[in-house]
């Protein structure tokens, strides 16, 4: 195998170990004389204080973000070219906008000739 392939294999092994390993932050030295100053592997790492161990990385959910309050946004945005929107665009609640919108060209999913949609 080439040197680059071996290096790539080692990097992948480190990444896999990082993903599937246990968080052992603040694990101190072991042994009977140093027992109160460090915890066993996987235990609380703050000695006799008794803080909980680290949890694994992971998350689940839909990914919605709720924003409450006023968000003063100022500025202008210029969009040139084609902006395809596939799917649904939805606003819930009052969405006040000040300014102007100009739409020109072929609107809707057409082939560009103003005919019937291509789907």
UniProtKB/Swiss-Prot annotation:
GO terms for molecular function: structural constituent of egg chorion. Residues 1-21 form the signal peptide. Residues 22-55 are annotated as: Left arm. Pfam families: Chorion_1. Residues 104-119 are annotated as: Right arm. Keywords: Repeat, Signal. GO terms for cellular component: egg chorion. Residues 56-103 are annotated as: Central domain. GO terms for biological process: chorion-containing eggshell formation. This protein is one of many from the eggshell of the silk moth. Belongs to the chorion protein family. This is Chorion class CA protein ERA.1. It comes from Bombyx mori (Silk moth). The gene is ERA.1.
């Amino acid at each position: 195998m080439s040197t680059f392939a071996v290096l790539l294999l080692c990097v992948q092994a480190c990444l896999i170990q990082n993903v599937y390993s246990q968080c052992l932050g603040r694990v101190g030295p072991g042994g009977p004389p140093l027992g109160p100053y460090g915890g066993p592997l996987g235990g609380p790492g703050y000695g006799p204080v008794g803080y909980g161990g680290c949890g694994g990385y992971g998350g689940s959910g839909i990914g919605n973000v709720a924003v409450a309050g006023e968000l003063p946004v100022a500025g202008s945005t210029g969009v040139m070219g084609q902006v395809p929107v596939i799917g649904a665009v939805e606003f819930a609640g009052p969405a006040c906008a000040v300014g102007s919108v100009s739409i020109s060209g072929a609107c809707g999913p057409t082939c560009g000739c103003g005919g019937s949609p291509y789907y």
